[in-house]
Structures are given as C-alpha cells and as structure tokens.
Amino acid sequence: MSMNDPLGDMLTRIRNAQMRGKSTVRTPGSKLRAWVLDVLKAEGYIRGYEEVTTEAGHKELEISLKYYEGTPVIRELARVSKPGRRVYAGAKELPQVRNGLGVSIVSTPKGVMSDAAARSANVGGEVLCTVF
C-alpha cells in the first residue's frame, strides 16, 4: 500500500493516540519524520522518540507522548503544506501560530526547524505543519 503523505500520516497517528490517552505511538521511520520529531521534542511537545526495528526488519519510530495533568500537551496539530498544495514562506512571512504561543515547523535549506529558529537564521522554506 502506498502512502501519499507520510508526514500527514504521522501527525494523524499522534493526534489519534493522544485522543485515546496512549503513552506511545509507532510510525514508519524516515529522515523527515525524525527531523520533525526533533523539533517537537526541542519545543517540549513530546517526551522523545526512538528508532526501533520490527521483526520484518522495517524501521519504525516509537514516539513517547507528553501529557500535563492528564491532558495532552499538543492541543492542535495541523498539516499546512500538502502534496497537492505546497506552501512556502520567506523568513519575514512565516506564520505565527496563536500569536506566538504555538510553533510552525519549517523545512529550510539549513534543515527542519521551528519558525522562531528560521526567523533568527533569516531563512524561509516550506511550512510543514503547525503545533499548538
């Protein structure tokens, strides 16, 4: 089965697992997914993740979700740039999520980073998703 939007699939798995109160969730592994998870961990939205190998030899990422007093830390997780409609923004046009309370994750020539890091590095790129 082919997957048209692997990053969107990972975000949906995280949303669904948090709605069910799960402590961890697994998703197929890729570099882009790992880079996005690095940003989520640095911003404090997840506890962390580790790469595991299944019995079939496939690599998966096991994500440890974060809760505060029983409620998920991630309230809103949305894909912005989709395979059918890519969204790009310059350093000055990067969107602010909830007046700066949330984070946009951006794929730049210098790597995947948060909107604040991209603004300070003065680089723009593809706006992958927003987190609040």
From Swiss-Prot:
Record has Lyase as a keyword: no
Keywords: Ribonucleoprotein, Ribosomal protein, RNA-binding, rRNA-binding
Keyword Cell division: no
PROSITE patterns (alphabetical): RIBOSOMAL_S8
A single GO BP: translation
Cysteine pairings via disulfide bonds: none
Similarity comment text for this entry: Belongs to the universal ribosomal protein uS8 family.
Subunit structure: Part of the 30S ribosomal subunit. Contacts proteins S5 and S12.
Protein name listed in UniProt: Small ribosomal subunit protein uS8
This protein's encoding gene: rpsH
